[in-house]
């Protein structure tokens, strides 16, 4: 009887082993995975096997997405110990370790068991690839407790379900490390890692140097990542207990693929897979602009990307070295204008809003303390420099105290946080008086909206609108240079009586531009209305408009490549402000070379908001039956169907980029080899790997990095794609221009054939074409 039972158990064990061996997602103990073999997760989402990245001949054991056409590796076992032939074999040993052997049967890589696992509990260990992309070692029959898992030892990829952070009990710290290059998965220069000192936060480092800091979690998001918002793709979660602190996310729809990757160039970016394009689409970046550079403005300095210069001292502080500050070196930061009165108990706090909170490594926190008690605790400690709520939800709760200097602060237009900065009581009284005077002036300005100048004043300033003062002719009338009685030089936009800009457009331009403040937008100073006369008074830009340089055979040489690329970046920042960062969401609708002015330092200033349209906070598109704009710059969907969106401006920006690079107009472009316009010509050259041939010869000597110019051309082509959905948002454009993020291949541009512009498709549209090919046009669509 006993022998029968033993035989029965042996049969069951043998049968179970056979079933496991037949499973495509499992390896059993001592079973071998050879180069050329793979195991695939049960749902077919991920595959494990050997691969060679890019043009490399080295072999690695890795995990990649199974269902997509582009091999995307999410984890590499032997990243620093490559195989040099096809001899690699993988086994799971009886003690629960994964072992990778080379041709000499030497172990070149092995897994380490989880700190919490007990080898005594091992029984029939197996290795399995899950549909989450997690490669696990577990006991046969136990799918809950893992002996080891790849998600505990990530490489450059943050996958759904991974606990990205630190376990205080086991000491396990899960962090990202970049590849050395796109075809070399060995340990790269960049890491993104949780620092538990003070209030935990993530630090992106290049080797040992901090590049970017996320800031602490405030209950809704990291304070240094305002773009992290609830979305339909994934649901994120932050867990902070006595045992562990980590950030994780889960897919809202398992069929949607998304990943966060630390690229070899240090860019920490999220991508989503677009099936119809068969490519990864950029979705979000941790770093947005130069203000994200760690401690750019030094101690007690704050960075605002919409200001020029970007750095300024917090209220109550002054530059430590004024000369360096003026020269653009802000690294030494700021110091207190008035020393603290801590010993006398007369200090107070100034509330500063919409901030990225300072570095919290030297901070202290209490999750439950109320804000009033938080303030008292800070006042009792002379080294306490600021305080803030730990969690901003439900009106705020908890307490963070900072000790020592406040560093790495920046300002946002939205989703920033309140910080209470310690100042001497006398300093607070001074600031309150200044604030009261400023508020009074602002109220007066809001009541008046803009200063009104009478006709006589404007006429005298422009010498009676003399021909000698005329700067140029726009679509809505002439522009004159003027000098006010106070000596200030101005530009006067005088609307012609036959101008197509009616009262509506005039009011629109006043209301819009009066509310806009950005270093890359022209500043309006006042207006004049007298019977049929309507005029706008702007700050004067001595270098006039961009088109007077790039399209002029002689003056184009004054704009070398460094200046041109800065102009492109300036225009991009200005458009991003209009689309996302201003109090209003604005579509310009007439972005072109003649509407970009240049100041004395050749900084770009976007002008002419007569055609601009505002959208609601969540709107991104609208329709019109009155199409207005300029041929050569208007997007196809707008010119043909009257459909305009933020992507319409992106199209115009792309045209402008290609014009700046080439020194040629899109409209009227001629080439002996074809009948394409500039967009079509640039696209054709790009496809033939000859994009460099469109570069303006005037910048050849100053163009020391051809790859930068080719990248700008590439970005321009992405902006002018036919389908608006394919075009990037301006936030992505700014990021592409300021980083080395990977770029998708551009698709066919819109209106790339000059000869077939639109006449065959729009017979119902009555075109009203102005005599000047480069003036603003108006199309009345009767539909």
From Swiss-Prot:
Residues annotated as region CaM-binding? 554-571
- Phosphothreonine carried by residues: 624
Q: Which residues form a coiled coil?
A: none
Where on the chain is Phosphoserine found, per UniProt?
A: 499, 594, 607, 771
From the UniProt annotation, give the residues forming the signal peptide: 1-23
The residues that the entry says bind ATP are 471-479, 493
Q: Which domain of life is it from?
A: Eukaryota
| Residue ranges occupied by any PAN domain in the UniProt entry | 342-424
One GO biological process from the UniProt record? recognition of pollen
Positions annotated as glycosylated: 30, 95, 189, 381
Q: NADP among the record's keywords?
A: no
A single GO molecular function, which one?
ATP binding
Q: What is its EC number?
A: 2.7.11.1
Q: Which SMART domains match?
A: B_lectin, PAN_AP, S_TKc
Q: Which residues form the EGF-like domain?
A: 287-323
Location of the active site: 590
The Bulb-type lectin domain extends over 24-150
> What is the catalytic activity of this protein?
L-seryl-[protein] + ATP = O-phospho-L-seryl-[protein] + ADP + H(+); L-threonyl-[protein] + ATP = O-phospho-L-threonyl-[protein] + ADP + H(+)
Disulfide cysteine pairs (residue numbers): 291-303, 297-311, 374-399, 378-384
Q: Which Pfam families match?
A: B_lectin (PF01453), PAN_2 (PF08276), PK_Tyr_Ser-Thr (PF07714), S_locus_glycop (PF00954)
Could you say which enzyme class this protein belongs to? transferase
UniProt-listed SUPFAM superfamilies: alpha-D-mannose-specific plant lectins (SSF51110), Protein kinase-like (PK-like) (SSF56112)
Q: Which family does it belong to?
A: Belongs to the protein kinase superfamily. Ser/Thr protein kinase family.
Q: What is this protein called?
A: G-type lectin S-receptor-like serine/threonine-protein kinase At4g27290
């Amino acid at each position: 009887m006993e022998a029968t039972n033993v035989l029965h158990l042996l049969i069951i064990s043998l049968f179970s082993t056979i079933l496991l061996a037949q499973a495509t997602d499992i390896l059993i103990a001592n079973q071998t995975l050879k180069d050329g073999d793979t195991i695939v997760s049960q749902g077919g989402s991920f595959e494990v096997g050997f691969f060679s990245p890019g043009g490399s001949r080295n072999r690695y054991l890795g995990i990649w997405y199974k269902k997509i056409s582009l091999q995307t590796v999410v984890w590499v076992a032997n990243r620093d110990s490559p195989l040099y032939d096809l001899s690699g074999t993988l086994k799971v040993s009886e003690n629960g370790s994964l072992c990778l052997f080379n041709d000499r049967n030497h172990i070149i890589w092995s897994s380490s068991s989880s700190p919490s696992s007990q080898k005594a509990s091992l029984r029939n260990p197996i290795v399995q690839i899950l549909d989450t992309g997690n490669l696990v070692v577990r006991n046969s029959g136990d799918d809950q407790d893992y002996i080891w898992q790849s998600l505990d030892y990530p490489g450059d990829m943050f996958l759904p379900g991974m606990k990205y952070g630190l376990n205080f009990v086991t000491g396990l710290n899960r962090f990202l490390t970049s590849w050395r290059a796109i075809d070399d998965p060995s340990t790269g220069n960049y890491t993104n890692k949780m620092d538990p000192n003070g209030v935990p936060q993530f630090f992106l480092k290049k080797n040992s140097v901090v590049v970017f800091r996320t800031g602490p979690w405030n209950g809704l998001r990291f304070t240094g990542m305002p773009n992290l918002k609830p979305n339909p793709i994934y649901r994120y979660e932050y867990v902070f207990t006595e045992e562990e602190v980590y950030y994780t996310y889960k897919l809202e729809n398992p069929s949607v693929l998304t990943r966060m990757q630390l690229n070899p160039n240090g860019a920490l970016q999220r991508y989503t897979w677009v099936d119809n394009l068969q490519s990864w689409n950029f979705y979000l970046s941790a770093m947005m602009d130069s203000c994200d550079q760690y401690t750019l403005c030094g101690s007690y300095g704050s960075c605002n990307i919409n200001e020029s210069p970007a750095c300024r001292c917090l209220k109550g502080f002054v530059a430590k070295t004024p000369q360096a500050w003026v020269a653009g070196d802000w690294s030494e930061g700021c110091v207190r204008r008035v020393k603290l009165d801590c010993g006398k108990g007369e200090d107070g706090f100034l509330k500063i809003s919409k901030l990225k909170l300072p570095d919290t490594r030297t901070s202290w926190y209490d999750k439950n303390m109320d804000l009033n008690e938080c303030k008292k605790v800070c006042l009792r400690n002379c080294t306490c420099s600021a305080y803030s709520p730990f969690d901003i939800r439900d009106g705020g709760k908890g307490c963070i105290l900072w000790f020592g200097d406040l560093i790495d602060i920046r300002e946002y237009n939205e989703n920033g946080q309140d910080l209470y900065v310690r100042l001497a009581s006398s300093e607070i009284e001074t600031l309150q008086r200044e604030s009261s005077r400023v508020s009074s002036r602002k109220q007066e300005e809001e009541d008046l909206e803009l200063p009104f100048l009478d006709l006589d004043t404007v006429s005298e300033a422009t010498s009676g609108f003399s021909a000698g003062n005329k700067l140029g002719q726009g679509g809505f009338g002439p522009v004159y240079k003027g000098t006010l009685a106070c000596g200030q030089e101005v530009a006067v936009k005088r609307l012609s009586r036959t101008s197509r800009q009616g009262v509506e457009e005039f009011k629109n331009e006043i209301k819009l531009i009066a509310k806009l403040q950005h270093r890359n937008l022209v500043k309006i100073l006042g207006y004049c209305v007298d019977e049929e006369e309507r005029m706008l008074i702007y700050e004067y830009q001595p270098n006039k408009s961009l088109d007077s340089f790039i399209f002029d055979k002689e003056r184009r040489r004054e704009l070398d490549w460094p200046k041109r690329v800065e102009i492109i970046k300036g225009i991009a920042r200005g458009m991003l402000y209009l689309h996302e960062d201003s109090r209003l969401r604005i579509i310009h609708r007439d972005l072109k070379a003649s509407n970009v002015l240049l100041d004395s330092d050749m900084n770009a200033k976007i002008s002419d908001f007569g055609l601009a349209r505002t959208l609601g906070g969540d709107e991104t598109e609208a329709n019109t039956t009155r199409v207005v704009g300029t041929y050569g710059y208007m997007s196809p969907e707008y010119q043909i169907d009257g459909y305009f969106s933020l992507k319409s401006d992106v199209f115009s920006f792309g045209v402008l980029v290609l014009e700046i690079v080439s020194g040629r107009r899109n409209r009227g472009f001629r080439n002996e080899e074809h009948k394409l316009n500039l967009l079509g010509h640039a696209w054709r050259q790009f496809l033939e790997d000859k994009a460099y041939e469109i570069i303006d010869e005037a910048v050849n000597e100053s163009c020391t990095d051809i790859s930068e110019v080719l990248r700008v051309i590439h970005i321009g082509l992405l902006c002018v794609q036919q389908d608006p959905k394919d075009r990037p948002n301006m936030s992505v454009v700014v990021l592409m221009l300021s980083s080395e993020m990977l770029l998708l291949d551009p698709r066919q541009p819109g209106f790339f054939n000059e000869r077939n512009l639109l006449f065959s498709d729009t017979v119902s549209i009555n075109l009203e074409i102005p005599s000047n090919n480069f003036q603003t046009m108006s199309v009345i669509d009767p539909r």
